[in-house]
């Protein structure tokens, strides 16, 4: 994808379950994050393209704290946004099956005139056709040594409590999770490429959001 027209992200305040803060390009917005995102995205675009512009991003599990009382939310120790979206009108579509690249320039958000759109489109095509040095030669990846932030006994106790609540009818669905961490000095894109080759999946995305934060959804 090319440059985003604007950026939306929200992060829950530590230890609060209902107080959410939404930022639009660094400016705080006092409104429900999902309602605001729905308002600012253009609807009803007729296009033959598989993606006609709009919002791309993610909303994490902790967003439920804005709408349901789930008790105390654990302290955020890594600083990753609970919700993050980019709004696009200029982007590239990679068709891996047909081995084609589609260049898309639109004005649905910026309101640029047609001459500006055509000029931007031509510049992107020129950049793509310009021979560039190979800066993305994958490096050999070393095995990672992971550590978990929850001890096994603690996690198994969480499982036992969840089963008990389900049997008693107080809960019908539960998602238990824990975070694994490892030191990694290589390029995140190389890790993603290696994962895509060694263990491909239809649900596999490399998401580059903010400085020093890269997400791989698998």
Regions found by a protein language model. Name each.
Residues 1-218:
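Extended alpha-helical targeting/anchoring segments
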